[in-house]
Curated annotation (Swiss-Prot):
Name of encoding gene: TCTP
PROSITE patterns: TCTP_2, TCTP_3
InterPro entries reported for this sequence: Mss4-like_sf, Mss4/transl-control_tumour, TCTP, Translation_control_tumour_CS, Translational_control_tumour_p
Organism: Plasmodium berghei (strain Anka)
Lineage, top ranks: Eukaryota, Sar, Alveolata, Apicomplexa, Aconoidasida
Family recorded in the similarity comment: Belongs to the TCTP family.
An example Gene Ontology molecular-function term: calcium ion binding
Function text: Involved in calcium binding and microtubule stabilization.
Localization (cell): Cytoplasm
Parts of the chain that traverse the membrane: none
PANTHER family: TRANSLATIONALLY CONTROLLED TUMOR PROTEIN-RELATED, TRANSLATIONALLY-CONTROLLED TUMOR PROTEIN
Cellular component, GO, one term: cytoplasm
Name of the featured protein: Translationally-controlled tumor protein homolog
Superkingdom of the organism of origin: Eukaryota
Keywords: Calcium, Cytoplasm
Length: 171
């Protein structure tokens, strides 16, 4: 299994157990980012056969049950809010940091990043109100943000990751 980690914090943010798709259904963005679909799951309500637990049940589920988004729960992502102005300042700094990283570690990616990043960020800024932003476990604002949005009538969000802000680790 491959786990994707943030290049600046080593936070685990995704894995290859999620099918990667073109971000926002746009193949143009595929060279710079990927999108995965999340699912909801039930967390809690562990019954180890100690008792019948019926006194705690509400509608067939225990009081300690919660519905979670699998990616958020598995990788301990935390939602954060940013104004458009704050996001613009953040993304400018973040893109410069990635560019510097690429110049040092992957110079063959520099031109691709320069040409493909701007249309992706423009799309995010144009649709800014449709996004929720997530941070990795370290809660470091210098790290990459993860972009979440709902596609059409889907009941769970999709998550978009900037590929050059991640590295793969095999387990």
């Amino acid at each position: 299994m491959k786990v994707y980690k943030d290049i600046f914090t080593n936070d685990e943010v995704c894995s290859d157990s999620y099918i990667q798709e073109d971000p926002f259904g746009n193949a143009e963005f595929r060279e710079i980012a990927f999108e995965v679909k999340s699912n909801k799951r039930i967390k809690g309500n562990d019954d180890y056969g100690i008792a019948d637990n019926s006194e705690d049940a509400v509608d067939g589920m225990g009081a300690d049950v919660e519905h979670v988004i699998d990616i958020v729960d598995s990788f301990q992502l935390t939602s954060t809010s940013l104004s458009k102005k704050e996001y613009s300042a953040y993304v400018k700094n973040f893109m410069q940091r990635i560019l510097k990283h690429l110049e040092e570690k992957k110079p063959d990616r520099v031109n691709i990043f320069k040409t493909k990043a701007q249309p992706l960020i423009k799309h995010i800024l144009t649709n800014f109100d449709d996004f929720e932003f997530y941070m990795g476990e370290s809660l470091d604002m210098e790290a990459g943000l993860i972009y979440s949005y709902y596609k059409g009538e889907e009941i769970t969000p999709r998550f978009v990751y900037i590929s050059d802000g991640l590295f793969e680790e095999k387990y």
